[in-house]
């Protein structure tokens, strides 16, 4: 491992952020810290993850939502101090890593099936040999 990777891993450990497991197709709620003058508040951005970019400290993801009939996409840096929390609302069942095709779709054709049996997977614990 080279020096840059070591420094990035130390920085990630220092940030001590808990990041949930999410994938493209999942519906997430991203709570963003917004500063307006002297006031600081949380703003929720709820949408579908259409892309995920894993690059260590520079990891990011794109969330798409429809607001007032207009498609809105926002790119978030995973380890940004502006992100208060990421909450996975619903797991999506998709077969692609990048869901850019959703940009050209609207209505029912833009819907994503929900992945069933996700809660059962979390409950399974490894069996210990006696």
Swiss-Prot record:
InterPro entries: Ribosomal_bL19, Ribosomal_bL19_CS, Ribosomal_bL19_sf, Translation_prot_SH3-like_sf. Signal peptide: none annotated. One of its GO terms (cellular component) is cytosolic large ribosomal subunit. GO terms for molecular function: structural constituent of ribosome. Keywords: Ribonucleoprotein, Ribosomal protein. The keyword Ribosomal protein applies. Belongs to the bacterial ribosomal protein bL19 family. This is Large ribosomal subunit protein bL19. It comes from Polaromonas naphthalenivorans (strain CJ2).
């Amino acid at each position: 491992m080279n020096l840059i990777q070591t420094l990035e891993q130390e920085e990630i450990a220092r940030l001590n952020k808990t990041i949930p497991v999410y994938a493209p197709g999942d519906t997430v709620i991203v709570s963003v810290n917004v500063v307006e003058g002297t006031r600081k508040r949380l703003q929720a951005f709820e949408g579908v993850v259409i892309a995920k970019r894993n690059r260590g400290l520079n990891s990011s993801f794109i969330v798409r939502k429809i607001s007032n009939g207009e498609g809105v996409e926002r790119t978030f840096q995973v380890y940004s101090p502006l992100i208060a929390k990421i909450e996975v609302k619903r797991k999506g069942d998709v077969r692609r890593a990048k869901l850019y095709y959703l940009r050209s779709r609207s209505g029912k054709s833009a819907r994503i099936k929900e992945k069933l049996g996700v809660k059962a997977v979390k409950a399974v614990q490894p069996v210990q040999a006696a």
